[in-house]
Amino acid sequence: MEEIQVTFLNMLKVERNFSAHTLKSYHDDLVQFNHFLEQELINLRTFEYKDARNYLSYLYSQNLKRTTVSRKISTLRTFYEFWMTQDETIINPFVQLVHPKKENYLPQFFYEEEMEALFETVAKDTKKGLRDRVILELLYATGIRVSELVNIQLKDIDMSLPGVKVLGKGNKERFVPFGEFCRQSIEQYLREFKPIQHTKHSFLLVNMNGAPITERGVRYVLNDVVKRTAGVTEIHPHKLRHTFATHLLNQGADLRTVQSLLGHVNLSTTGRYTHVSNQQLRKVYLNAHPRAKKESK
């Protein structure tokens, strides 16, 4: 990897406070780009617009989703923008490239009865169950990202309100409330889960050895819960984030409030990540449209 690319990644880590997961995506995008340059015998410095178009075609030939192609092009556009600040002779070859349109899709979410089934699966009387329940409760009750979840420290939890302070993207801090079920789960976990009582750190969530749990560890916990839950086949942390937002909107929460809770800068981002179910759309329509129902005579 070129020195300027390493400097770029360090900038994203130090100045923009990107998560390890996001940094890996940027790194992998640059590695793939470098591989293309080697194949085509193109120099990074002399790479130009026609080469950018060829690279776009190359990405599509790999049968990648449009959203993935869009992200990879965005990575390179951002990289060249950074390089231009370091070297006045550099021109961004991706600036004129038409951004691939993203596919429209409805984010996956759990129905309320599916969430209840997940909670019923988690044991209430085992050490592991106490910890796993807190993970599930916090993700569903607050809609926080998994990267935010694993970085919660004991001082971030406020049992009086109750709620949690999280550090989101761009090093932005926000407070997210949670309900009584979540509060009780956290209290029982802190009171009875032995590994956390003997730690030398202040992270809320730990593994069975008392070390801070990782994002990978959280995904393992969720997959284990799903395997034991009838009628539920797939789960990931962001699906719980979608579920959190969807259920709030279905119960009448306004988009601005959900935006604040999710930690989104732009309302349009919230619009992409949240939606109401088809059943709720029909319910609103039937209640609101003057000719939705035919009156009986």
From Swiss-Prot:
<feature type="active site">
    <location>
        <position position="241"/>
    </location>
</feature>
<dbReference type="GO" id="GO:0007059">
    <property type="term" value="P:chromosome segregation"/>
</dbReference>
<feature type="active site">
    <location>
        <position position="145"/>
    </location>
</feature>
<protein>
    <recommendedName>
        <fullName>Tyrosine recombinase XerC</fullName>
    </recommendedName>
</protein>
<keyword id="KW-0159">Chromosome partition</keyword>
<dbReference type="Pfam" id="PF02899">
    <property type="entry name" value="Phage_int_SAM_1"/>
</dbReference>
<keyword id="KW-0132">Cell division</keyword>
<feature type="active site">
    <location>
        <position position="238"/>
    </location>
</feature>
<dbReference type="InterPro" id="IPR011931">
    <property type="entry name" value="Recomb_XerC"/>
</dbReference>
<keyword id="KW-0233">DNA recombination</keyword>
<dbReference type="Pfam" id="PF00589">
    <property type="entry name" value="Phage_integrase"/>
</dbReference>
<dbReference type="InterPro" id="IPR044068">
    <property type="entry name" value="CB"/>
</dbReference>
<dbReference type="InterPro" id="IPR010998">
    <property type="entry name" value="Integrase_recombinase_N"/>
</dbReference>
<comment type="similarity">
    <text>Belongs to the 'phage' integrase family. XerC subfamily.</text>
</comment>
<keyword id="KW-0131">Cell cycle</keyword>
<dbReference type="GO" id="GO:0006313">
    <property type="term" value="P:DNA transposition"/>
</dbReference>
<feature type="active site">
    <location>
        <position position="264"/>
    </location>
</feature>
<dbReference type="InterPro" id="IPR023009">
    <property type="entry name" value="Tyrosine_recombinase_XerC/XerD"/>
</dbReference>
<feature type="active site">
    <location>
        <position position="169"/>
    </location>
</feature>
<comment type="function">
    <text>Site-specific tyrosine recombinase, which acts by catalyzing the cutting and rejoining of the recombining DNA molecules. The XerC-XerD complex is essential to convert dimers of the bacterial chromosome into monomers to permit their segregation at cell division. It also contributes to the segregational stability of plasmids.</text>
</comment>
<comment type="subunit">
    <text>Forms a cyclic heterotetrameric complex composed of two molecules of XerC and two molecules of XerD.</text>
</comment>
<feature type="domain" description="Core-binding (CB)">
    <location>
        <begin position="1"/>
        <end position="84"/>
    </location>
</feature>
<feature type="domain" description="Tyr recombinase">
    <location>
        <begin position="105"/>
        <end position="286"/>
    </location>
</feature>
<dbReference type="InterPro" id="IPR050090">
    <property type="entry name" value="Tyrosine_recombinase_XerCD"/>
</dbReference>
<dbReference type="GO" id="GO:0051301">
    <property type="term" value="P:cell division"/>
</dbReference>
<dbReference type="GO" id="GO:0005737">
    <property type="term" value="C:cytoplasm"/>
</dbReference>
<dbReference type="InterPro" id="IPR004107">
    <property type="entry name" value="Integrase_SAM-like_N"/>
</dbReference>
<feature type="active site" description="O-(3'-phospho-DNA)-tyrosine intermediate">
    <location>
        <position position="273"/>
    </location>
</feature>
<dbReference type="InterPro" id="IPR011010">
    <property type="entry name" value="DNA_brk_join_enz"/>
</dbReference>
<dbReference type="GO" id="GO:0009037">
    <property type="term" value="F:tyrosine-based site-specific recombinase activity"/>
</dbReference>
<keyword id="KW-0963">Cytoplasm</keyword>
<keyword id="KW-0238">DNA-binding</keyword>
<dbReference type="InterPro" id="IPR002104">
    <property type="entry name" value="Integrase_catalytic"/>
</dbReference>
<dbReference type="GO" id="GO:0003677">
    <property type="term" value="F:DNA binding"/>
</dbReference>
<keyword id="KW-0229">DNA integration</keyword>
<dbReference type="InterPro" id="IPR013762">
    <property type="entry name" value="Integrase-like_cat_sf"/>
</dbReference>
